Amino acid sequence: MKKQILRAVFLSFSLLFIGLANIAAQEGDSKAVAGGGVMVKGWTGKIDAKEQTAGLTLNSAKLSQDGKALHVTTGPATTYWNPKNVAKGDYTVSATFLEPKYMSLNDHPHPYGIVIGGSDLGTDQESYLYCAAYGNGTYIVRGFGPKPFQMGGRAPAKDDAVAKAAGVGQPVTQLIAVTVKGDKVSCSINNKVVATFDKSAVVAAGKLKSTDGVYGIRFAHNTDATVTGLKVTKAK
């Protein structure tokens, strides 16, 4: 009987180890970008705390300007913003994200998207919400307050509105927008609302301090894409 119990315990730990190993393999290590740093006037950024723990810095990712486009290459997962870009009241923040070569820096999809409600950015008390799309037809709505939190679940959600790349190395474009209007906060991708939340569920302990705040962009690790048309407009 004792041998059977020991076998069961051993099997359970073995399966747990394999599961954790698979998760680690899926997440992968962030690869520092050569010649990195923030090269767009007025902009700054912050990498995730776990990336800092791994010894990476803001210079391990790169934000540059190609004509009218912001060009981001990561590196560690990074959030970028210009402190002058502030949205208040009812508004929509939107931009177009182009991943010219899907999964060019990784072996699985990684997301990028819009940040809103930024407060105390760049500090250990920062808070913000972001809606981000993957080039495989899924999206997430998450944030920091200052610890990470998820809206609508941990796993990426599928929606037909989210564009899918034709294959690895192929281009994929996403128009992403976050709207604050009245008591609702919503995320739209390619002109379709894919998620809506009560503002009271977003502005809460451990989440946003307010939906008023700095807006910007966020990229997961090991991703390369451009951003055009980043703007704030009055919510309709």
Spell out what each predicted region is.
Residues 95, 228-232:
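Extracellular beta-strand elements of beta-rich domains used
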Residues 149-175:
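Short, aromatic/His-centered strand-loop micro-motif at the edge of beta-sheets
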Residues 197-228:
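Flexible glycan-contacting loops in extracellular carbohydrate-active proteins
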Residues 1-10:
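Bacterial N-terminal signal peptides that target proteins for export
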Residues 95, 169-201:
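Carbohydrate-binding surfaces in secreted/extracellular proteins
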Residues 74-150:
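Secretory/extracellular carbohydrate-interaction modules
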Residues 9-21:
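Bacterial N-terminal signal peptides
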Residues 26-104:
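Low-complexity, Ser/Thr/Pro/Gly-rich disordered linker/stalk regions
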